[in-house]
Amino acid sequence: NLSQTPYTNWTVKQADLVTYRSEGFDLVYCIGVLHHLQDPAAGFRAVVANVRPGGRLHCWVYAKEGNGLVILLVEPIRKIASKLPWRVNKYLVAAPLALFFFFYAKLLAKAVPHKVFSRFPMYSYCRWIAKRGFSFFHHVVFDQLVTPQTEYLERSTIENWLEDSRIDPSSTYILMRNGNSWKFGGRAT
């Protein structure tokens, strides 16, 4: 929440990411958008284009790594559910799936950390999300199912994006978050 920081000159922009052009921001923060675009790489290029020289960019996307179960089971459901009326999707599709996910995550969170459990699908993510209540799980599952497009991105794709000549190579970072997503960024030249 930026209102709780000393920064006084900030703006939240909501626009078509791929076509939006600005004079450049000190920070462009793009979370959960790129992986839903028809062309995620074009979206990333737009992020970079909207950072002023010396400014920073930070992005977060779904990883291909660590999401095998989601890709195998949830993606086929999403392709159908995303075409349904949102209330049907939210309450008749997402809610039952969220209930299963809720209990699975809570079970993994209660398990004593052990090498065997760490091999369960989405172990790290489940231990993180298990701290939340059911409504958060429901929101996450619905968010996963409502979008018409999702692309799970490999680390190598992110590495290639960060080779953009407009980004200082010494400033880049890629971190796996919760075993199933990438957070990454750098400083514009």
What do these predicted regions represent?
Residues 26-40:
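A short SAM/SAH-binding and catalytic strip from SAM-dependent methyltransferases
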Residues 56-99, 117:
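Conserved class I S-adenosyl-L-methionine
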Residues 84-148:
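SAM-dependent methyltransferase
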